[in-house]
Amino acid sequence: MAIKMRLQRFGVHKRPFYRVVASESKNARDGKFLEILGTYDTILDIVELDHNKVQKWLSNGAQPTKTVKKVFKKSKFVAKTNTKVEK
């Protein structure tokens, strides 16, 4: 199954708070997840990510959603890539 990094909604009415989680793509938005990768508060615009966990899931083939990519940009997260230089 495909693993997605996506937002899981918490909070109260008109005060959303999100967790960034890794979950299987067929699970519900607020359903079962594999691991919590961080949090995102939209009101205060605060992003907290565990960069090691995010990098681990990216290297294992997890695909971030469009919204999670925007959250990564806000937190200034840069994914490490394995670039090989050929001579």
Curated annotation (Swiss-Prot):
One Pfam family recorded for the sequence: Ribosomal_S16
UniProt keyword annotation of Ribosomal protein present: yes
A biological-process GO annotation: translation
GO CC annotations on file: cytoplasm; small ribosomal subunit
Annotated keywords: Ribonucleoprotein, Ribosomal protein
Signal peptide range: none
Keyword Acetylation: no
One GO MF term attached to the UniProt entry: structural constituent of ribosome
Family: Belongs to the bacterial ribosomal protein bS16 family.
PANTHER family, sorted: 30S RIBOSOMAL PROTEIN S16, SMALL RIBOSOMAL SUBUNIT PROTEIN BS16M
Annotated protein name in UniProt: Small ribosomal subunit protein bS16
Record gene name: rpsP
